[in-house]
Amino acid sequence: MSKLSEKKIIELFQSKLGNASFVPEDVELFKIGKEQLVVKVDTFVESTDLPPRMKLDDAARKSIVSCVSDFAAKGVRPIFGIVSLTIPKKFSRSSIQSLARGFQIAAREFSLKILGGDTNEGKELVITFSLFGTTKKIVTRSGAKTNHVIITSGPFGYTGAGLSILLKNKKSSKKFGTKAKTAVLKHMIQYFSLLRPPDSFVEDDRCFQQTCLP
């Protein structure tokens, strides 16, 4: 990314797209009938997000977890997902199957249905995942009031620190380093059970084989 801050980059797009301001939340939303459609998109890039020890199925799962965690923060249940893949030519059939397995695991874990997506060839692995859901009201950043209780699924900062340790060889204490690296390699979150329906499904893992495998 350029030397411009993320905020400045967004402002440049705002000026060209005619939006006075994007929704200042972790998700995008717009009204459809009596409900709001909630959308989240996140991109996983091999050179900046994939530590040497991370397995490809964990990488695929992580790309979905990044979106699901923002849905959880807004009190929204994920329903559908779409994935776009840029796959290096060097990837073997086994590597691509590992990616498909990671998507399948996450879809079942978070009770969402992956509808399909797009595949391309490139120099490195890039996963862009879009998540969709509906709600009547989200938990906004501006909604916090005095005496409200804030609940998190774990401590903050371990994933970012772990990436710095694994990708940039940053130094840390052994205890902290172990926790940080584990946070990256496992990328586990505890999702609110009240947001999850009793059934768990993925459309059909054959769709990955048909679109991704030679």
Tell what function each PLM region has.
Residues 1-214:
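Helix-biased detector of long, well-ordered alpha-helical tracts
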